[in-house]
């Protein structure tokens, strides 16, 4: 850095001079060394002043000029952070719709027992879209929602793939009891997972808590009904699944409705001791 020690410039009635500022310790330096580059000047700063090459400025005035001080219009463009949309309603929509259709089939509503036509719904809307919502929750830093939506998105894909009987997943079993046991193991695993996620909603909203409560009962009844091949238990699981879906619809509506877009605005009721 080049400076003229023979002609100090008074900064404020002789209190501080350019010569004094240039001899400050370089702890506040924010620029590199100018060795070998004669056209590059160094930058030093202390509490009140900033030195740019051979010129010294008051810190307050320089920040005001850069539009970082008292709000005066400066020459530097302001940085506006990008706002991401909330992906949770999308995850709730894909889960609630798929759960409702499957539960109606499990409950044998209107005598329906074969749900192969809903395969596309399970794999694409319940599976792919919910998995996509979970990945978007990863982007916004919501670990819980990412885990729940991504996991259940995988569940719907697995369930739909099993219905296709690709690679003889079902028809390859010659013993119906063994097939029921394998499916029962699958449902038992999801019963445990859902219970763990349920324990993480004790300080959340009532809608989410009841959704996972009814869903865990759904998996439990379907699991037991599959193990013992009892259709009444499977139907009971279907009815609990309908309740779980209704809780999902309510939570979905509460998360997207507002006085600006609807005259009928509900609010999500929080659990006791919720933060």
Curated annotation (Swiss-Prot):
One of its GO terms (biological process) is transmembrane transport. GO terms for molecular function: acetate transmembrane transporter activity; ammonium channel activity. One of its GO terms (cellular component) is cell periphery. The chain crosses the membrane at residues 85-105, 121-141, 182-202, 208-228, 237-257. PROSITE patterns: GPR1_FUN34_YAAH (PS01114). The modification Phosphoserine is found at residue 4. Residues 1-84, 142-181, 229-236 are extracellular. Residues 106-120, 203-207, 258-275 are cytoplasmic. Belongs to the acetate uptake transporter (AceTr) (TC 2.A.96) family. PANTHER family: ACCUMULATION OF DYADS PROTEIN 2-RELATED (PTHR31123), AMMONIA TRANSPORT OUTWARD PROTEIN 3 (PTHR31123:SF3). This is Ammonia transport outward protein 3.
């Amino acid at each position: 850095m080049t400076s003229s020690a023979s002609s100090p410039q008074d900064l404020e009635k002789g209190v501080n001079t350019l010569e004094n500022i240039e001899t400050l310790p370089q702890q506040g330096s924010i620029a590199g060394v100018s060795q070998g580059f004669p056209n590059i000047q160094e930058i030093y700063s202390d509490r009140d002043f900033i030195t740019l090459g051979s010129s010294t400025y008051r810190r307050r005035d320089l920040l005001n000029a850069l539009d970082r001080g008292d709000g005066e219009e400066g020459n530097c463009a302001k940085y506006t952070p990008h706002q991401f949309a909330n992906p949770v309603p999308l995850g709730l929509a894909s889960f609630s719709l798929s759960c409702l259709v499957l539960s109606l089939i499990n409950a044998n509503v209107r005598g329906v027992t074969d749900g192969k036509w809903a395969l596309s719904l399970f794999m694409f809307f319940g599976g792919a879209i919910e998995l996509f919502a979970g990945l978007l929750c990863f982007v916004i830093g919501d670990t819980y929602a990412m885990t729940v939506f991504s996991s259940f998105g995988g569940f719907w894909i697995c369930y739909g793939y099993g219905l296709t009987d690709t690679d003889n997943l079902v028809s390859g079993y010659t013993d119906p009891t063994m097939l029921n046991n394998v499916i029962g193991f699958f449902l038992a695993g999801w019963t445990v997972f859902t219970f763990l996620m349920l324990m993480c909603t004790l300080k959340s909203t009532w809608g989410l808590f009841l959704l996972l409560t009814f869903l865990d009962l759904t998996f439990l009844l379907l699991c037991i009904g599959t193990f013992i091949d009892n259709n009444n238990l499977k139907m009971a699981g279907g009815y609990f699944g309908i309740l779980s879906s209704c809780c999902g619809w309510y939570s979905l509506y509460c998360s997207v409705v507002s006085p600006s877009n609807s005259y009928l605005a509900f609010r999500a009721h929080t659990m006791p001791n919720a933060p």
